[in-house]
C-alpha cells in the first residue's frame, strides 16, 4: 500500500496487525509539494515501513534512491538506519521478494554496493549529494568499474 501522505491515527491503526507493508514515497511528496507521510508515527505504532521512489514522469520523475533515503531521514524523521532498512529489506518484503532479496544473507541474491570511506552510516543519508558509492554488485558480480567520484 503506497501514497500514504495523509495517513492519520485511524489509518495507522487499520494497518497494525495486517501483513501489509506501508510503502512511503517521499520523492512524490517532494516533487508535488505535499506533506510527507507520517513515518515516525507509523514506526512508533509498531509498523514496518518501506521506501520507494514511485519513479514516473507525472509525480516523481526521479528514481534516485539516495534522495529517497535522504528525504526520509531529513523530512520524515526516520533515522538513517531505519531509512536504509526501509529501502532494502522492507522494500523487498513489500514486493513479496524478501526471501531472495533485500539483505546480505546466505542464500539470497547478492545485490549491494560498497561506499567510499564515511565517518558513519548517518553520513550516507545527510550527505546525499556527496558521491559515496564506489562499486555496485548485482548477483554477486561487480557492474562496470568503480563509480567516478
Please report, for each region that a protein language model flagged, where it lies by residue.
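C-terminal cap of metal-dependent C-N hydrolases
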Residues: 87-89, 109-149
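Structural signature of the urease/amidohydrolase superfamily beta/alpha-barrel
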Residues: 50-53, 92-93, 98-124
Amino acid at each position: 500500500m503506497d501514497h500514504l501522505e495523509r495517513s492519520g491515527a485511524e489509518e495507522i491503526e487499520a494497518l497494525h496487525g495486517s501483513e501489509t507493508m506501508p510503502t512511503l514515497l517521499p520523492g512524490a511528496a517532494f516533487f508535488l509539494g505535499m506533506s510527507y507521510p507520517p513515518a515516525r508515527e507509523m514506526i512508533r505504532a509498531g509498523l514496518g515501513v518501506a521506501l520507494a521512489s514511485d519513479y514516473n514522469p507525472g509525480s516523481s520523475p526521479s528514481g534516485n534512491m539516495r534522495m529517497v533515503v535522504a528525504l526520509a531521514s531529513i523530512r520524515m524523521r526516520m533515522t538513517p538506519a531505519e531509512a536504509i532498512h526501509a529501502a532494502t529489506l522492507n522494500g523487498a518484503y513489500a514486493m513479496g521478494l524478501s526471501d531472495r532479496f533485500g539483505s546480505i544473507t546466505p542464500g539470497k541474491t547478492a545485490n549491494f554496493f560498497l561506499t567510499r570511506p564515511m565517518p558513519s552510516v548517518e553520513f550516507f543519508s545527510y550527505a546525499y549529494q556527496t558521491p559515496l558509492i564506489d562499486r555496485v554488485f548485482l548477483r554477486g558480480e561487480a557492474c562496470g568499474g568503480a563509480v567516478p567520484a
